[in-house]
């Protein structure tokens, strides 16, 4: 079983409802071990939109990275994600942040996530649940990357 870290976010409609539905669907093919606190953050990229609720989860999977990506895209669609524009509003967004300590660079899948160490809504929730995680490209602890922390705790840990 591979250890995977996913970043989830929502900034449209009933954000908590979308998040809970996504977790429920992910549990059909992942063994979720830890979930970070849910944080509220400003949108990244295209900033003229609602704030996101973001968190990170740690899970075990028997799926290969590309299989996992396909299942995640299916979950996003089933939960209600509508395709808009790059960095636009999202009912649910699920990113593969890390898959074991692998480095994957294909047209459809980039692991670790290309902006992992730059986005506070990835770094701080991930460090909350895995304080000693190593960035597989730089081979340095993620805690050495300190993007400006603009996160506001939104609510408690949802469930494990």
Curated annotation (Swiss-Prot):
The answer, when asked if Transferase is one of the entry's keywords, is: yes
Show the Pfam families listed in the entry: HPPK
GO BP term, pick one: tetrahydrofolate biosynthetic process
The stretch of residues making up the signal peptide is none
- Kindly list the cysteine pairs connected by disulfide bridges: none
Q: Which InterPro entries match?
A: Hppk (IPR000550), Hppk_sf (IPR035907)
Q: What is its EC number?
A: 2.7.6.3
- GO MF, one example: ATP binding
Q: What is catalysed by this protein?
A: 6-hydroxymethyl-7,8-dihydropterin + ATP = (7,8-dihydropterin-6-yl)methyl diphosphate + AMP + H(+)
Family designation: Belongs to the HPPK family.
* Function, in words: Catalyzes the transfer of pyrophosphate from adenosine triphosphate (ATP) to 6-hydroxymethyl-7,8-dihydropterin, an enzymatic step in folate biosynthesis pathway.
Query: What is the recorded name of this protein?
Result: 2-amino-4-hydroxy-6-hydroxymethyldihydropteridine pyrophosphokinase
